[in-house]
UniProtKB/Swiss-Prot annotation:
Chief location category: membrane
Record's keyword annotation contains Lipid metabolism: no
Quaternary structure annotation from Swiss-Prot or TrEMBL: Part of a tripartite efflux system composed of MdtA, MdtB and MdtC. MdtB forms a heteromultimer with MdtC.
Protein name: Multidrug resistance protein MdtB
Originating organism: Shigella boydii serotype 4 (strain Sb227)
PANTHER family xrefs: MULTIDRUG RESISTANCE PROTEIN MDTB (PTHR32063:SF21), PTHR32063
Gene designation per UniProt: mdtB
The family this protein is said to belong to: Belongs to the resistance-nodulation-cell division (RND) (TC 2.A.6) family. MdtB subfamily.
Amino acid sequence: MQVLPPSSTGGPSRLFIMRPVATTLLMVAILLAGIIGYRALPVSALPEVDYPTIQVVTLYPGASPDVMTSAVTAPLERQFGQMSGLKQMSSQSSGGASVITLQFQLTLPLDVAEQEVQAAINAATNLLPSDLPNPPVYSKVNPADPPIMTLAVTSTAMPMTQVEDMVETRVAQKISQISGVGLVTLSGGQRPAVRVKLNAQAIAALGLTSETVRTAITGANVNSAKGSLDGPSRAVTLSANDQMQSAEEYRQLIIAYQNGAPIRLGDVATVEQGAENSWLGAWANKEQAIVMNVQRQPGANIISTADSIRQMLPQLTESLPKSVKVTVLSDRTTNIRASVDDTQFELMMAIALVVMIIYLFLRNIPATIIPGVAVPLSLIGTFAVMVFLDFSINNLTLMALTIATGFVVDDAIVVIENISRYIEKGEKPLAAALKGAGEIGFTIISLIFSLIAVLIPLLFMGDIVGRLFREFAITLAVAILISAVVSLTLTPMMCARMLSQESLRKQNRFSRASEKMFDRIIAAYGRGLAKVLNHPWLTLSVALSTLLLSVLLWVFIPKGFFPVQDNGIIQGTLQAPQSSSFANMAQRQRQVADVILQDPAVQSLTSFVGVDGTNPSLNSARLQINLKPLDERDDRVQKVIARLQTAVDKVPGVDLFLQPTQDLTIDTQVSRTQYQFTLQATSLDALSTWVPQLMEKLQQLPQLSDVSSDWQDKGLVAYVNVDRDSASRLGISMADVDNALYSAFGQRLISTIYTQANQYRVVLEHNTEITPGLAALDTIRLTSSDGGVVPLSSIAKVEQRFAPLSINHLDQFPVTTISFNVPDNYSLGDAVQAIMDTEKTLNLPVDITTQFQGSTLAFQSALGSTVWLIVAAVVAMYIVLGILYESFIHPITILSTLPTAGVGALLALMIAGSELDVIAIIGIILLIGIVKKNAIMMIDFALAAEREQGMSPRDAIYQACLLRFRPILMTTLAALLGALPLMLSTGVGAELRRPLGIGMVGGLIVSQVLTLFTTPVIYLLFDRLALWTKSRFARHEEEA
């Protein structure tokens, strides 16, 4: 047993060095907990940071946008506006549909928001139209969030009405019940119904009106309680044939008598089994289909939700006829898994590179094994803590662990290098471990807490960006803390038992060659450092110039919000002239689909035409383009989009707007392009005046592309101008006029057919194929007070006008959204500034307010807080270092290394053509924590040499630089190689990871070169300043 000197206490490491079994078992426990935690952690693309969002949809077939706004949307908005915790309320009122999107504060639980929404709907019920077919329906879903899965249901033998009926009752309901599913929408609109198409000439010839027919149908088809008979011995329930189930039964319905002869419905109308809404259609590739879009609840885990759906699909499809085919056209989790797999591979690559650099420096297998154990142990142990914090394995947490690879090895390297130095001097391994660990303990604590201090401001970032990076910061901090524990426990224990003078002195040809190389490098560094110390003011000017250069680079570098990801899915909006009909739009859509499907990168396509909860008007269509996997196509998504738009430009009469689907969705409205800018006013007239002027100017800006607006005020309207006096003399009310028009042209739902499985509608309309266009209005007949039949044309004139196709509100006021993309040679920051400058030139009136929305608003918020975030990180680190060193001066010396890192990071981003986005800013903040390690290691040893060996400050810092050169170089290269796989990543999701790697690699290279010279110079200058200050105070005290 070795006899230890009294001074060899080993500090906090002593207990673990002396008890190797306990230390080993403790580390095994950390390893097992981490492995169990890894298996229990869910997988997702990004941390779950969705705003609690609820969508409320109300359908009122036949109602104009103006009626939907005043009769449906406005009463609901007034009730919703009184809810607490509401962040933003937007609405879209179009022909027959009202969609209100409610976005709540991040702190409000979604279930609480749901209760408030239900209460508000109940309060507004009495204010809504009495003939509303169905009450408002809410869904816990963000309409702008792309579906997690899209399925197409087709059949070669069955009509689409039967297919939709089966899908709705057998498939969609079951999927809706899966935990995490927020909404299942069926696009294609082929719900079964009995359609009654009146022959206007026939009923007019018989002296009947559409109101007569409607009354007859509603009275003939009822489903109500009839009671029961309760006798002395038995009870009998009453039933009757009050329901009509088929088109044939309705065809035989007697609606009136004339001269004693019955007039049946089939005599004056075409009665057929059809679709409830004939102005809806969906296609999968070129085949008509029922398209099922599955959206998740905000906050639900996308991977587990998609897995549950796939597990249930075989069981659901077995219940369908063999002629019905269910195809999964898109699954966002495929790319998410691929992205996470690529990030995990880069994590393993980073570990391998770090271990390789350790061996290169230590040139000793036992010495390499020690940090080779410490690194994975620290990372794996982090998973156990992540489980307790409800984190997930996602791109950001894996990026944090990848970056942590370079951090966690630093502590082990510093400990090993210091212990090895004492062994090489002749100390016994155990004594060297105790002495070296005790000596380096304070340095390790300084490194750890100063690094964690940098991450603290990230935890206080506001809004969704702060939530997004909270998991990143905490995961990284936990890994760093675990590495500190491992470095002060396991690492010195392993050094005491695995290192020896023989093992350290044992050299092969590679060891000898590398040793000579390092000796030459250290000698050259020593000569260069001596020259630099002789010219301190020149070196100081270089340090100050880096500070100035970092500010200039910060001002001029292109700025963005979040990297545009290639997730293999493109969302598209097809726009046609505002007067386009459903048939015309469907034809144009099929032309565009043919062009898109010819592109070699496209795997499948779904498209939808018609007005529903997501599509506002008949002149627009929604498309989802699913690309082939990244390794099966030559181009990334942005190039594919450019190619598709060029190809579709050849199709006359349509405009196509495309944007890649992103994992992070901040918007609440389905947009044509990536970024949005809104104009809000107190009236639609103000918008109609200023929107065209602003659009004209924005379309001329080179910083913007694909500029479009949702302002569509040229929809054709047939305005029925009723002579109220004439109508009153005949006993005809405006309600009679509206009823007649609605029954003729509104696809009016007049009755319900009840079955055991579902409910179906009876739809009444005029057969416009007999009398098409505006001439159909001449066939409308009304009943006067004396029972006579009066043509509508005798009391009204029809005028053709223009009106908006949809009316949009933001927080209850009219709004229009201008959408835009940013060309490749400009940044989002350039675009935002150009829009703001253009707005100023217009001199908008005070009743017009403008605001960026969605990602652009988040970009402005993040950009505004970035400088303060960096300042907060620097201040936090200064406070921690000041407390640790009990000095106001030494923390400034350490922080003087930061500008060099900023210069390197910003230069690297500019050279690589990357924007300064949120991911890159996080990299710069991390650099603040990394590069100061060099200064800490130098200053710690210089202070110790001054204090213990009585050396002069110059000799102390010179010796410290030479002694710590190798660990400084080793730790910097380890951090650099930890970030290198992120910088060089090319797989799925590489766009998200690359800016972090580029910034860190560039910052580490420049800071490594400069701080090795600037830090000792600044240390000496501040030492002289401290001496001068002390002498001044001493002189004043003597004089006093």
